[in-house]
Amino acid sequence: MRIREVFSAIASAVLALQLLCVNLSAQSSPGNVTDIAVAPQYDTTHVYVAPEDFDRFVGSLMATFGGTTSKQGVFTVTPTPSSTMSQLVLTPVGTLSVFGFKTPIPYPFGAERTGYLVTDFDAAVQAARTTGADVLVTPFNDPIGRDAIIQWPGGVNTQLYWHTTAPSYKALQTIPENRVYVSADRVAAFVDSFLAFSHGSVISDDAHAPGVEIGRPSDTYRRIRIQSNFGKLTVLATDGQLPYPYGHEVTGYEVSDLPATLAKARAAGVQVLVPPYTAGQRTAALVQFPGGYIAEIHASSDK
């Protein structure tokens, strides 16, 4: 009886400890952060060009993808003194925030790849910290709202923003992908952090994706595709030994007719850096717009 009582007591203690651990984990889990995303059309790619290239760049985007623009203006969008031309480009395949600084660009601006609109700014900044991101630029006011710059594990910089008056953009025809290159050493930390923050899901995780996608057709690499209310995100985990221009493209734009889109792009002064190739259920090309912005453009190859 004593042995049975001892085992029973041990079992009860183990169960109590397990329940305590689960409870503590639930209280502290990054997965419990609030979902503060709005919609993919508010995930803006940030593009910095020289002021003299500004109009030509915006014009080439419009000629390639179509869409509309906001009124161009000159603003201070950093917490320290600066001056930049700024314009929003709303295309059916993605939204871009274009900057043409007339003054030196304060650090670390210019290194952020995208801006995410959030429903609750303070909660978003706290969620970023909770899920493992660094806050590189603490919250500050801009002419139309509030901003901060965060950095995910792996060195990926992102702007979080909130507008005093909520914007209203048309839903996109196709959702672009934020293309993030990270090292194999940091890919797990980046993915865990981003998933917890974004409430996203892994759509695919291919440990042997075709290397032609990163300019190395004889090799393979790891490609992870994630989707959330912020939009699509593709993680490219590589050894960093990439031929130009791979790694410079920030966004991949999905179109219905790649040859027609590339024809429009060429006519608008866009240079095709990597001719179309087919891999991973898409046909894709890499292009460079006037002003230097490099992008991937693709169409589904299984339609």
Where are these regions (language model features)?
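N-terminal secretory signal peptides that target proteins for export/translocation
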Residues: 1-7
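Bacterial N-terminal signal peptides
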Residues: 9-22
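Boundary at the C-terminal end of the N-terminal hydrophobic targeting segment
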Residues: 24-28
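Core segments of cupin and vicinal oxygen chelate
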Residues: 36-39, 46-94, 130, 138-153, ...
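Catalytic cores of nucleotide-enabled group-transfer and carboxylate-activating enzymes in metabolic
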Residues: 96-101, 133-136
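Short, structured interface segments
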Residues: 148-169
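Short beta->alpha transition motifs characteristic of CBS
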Residues: 161-166, 297-303
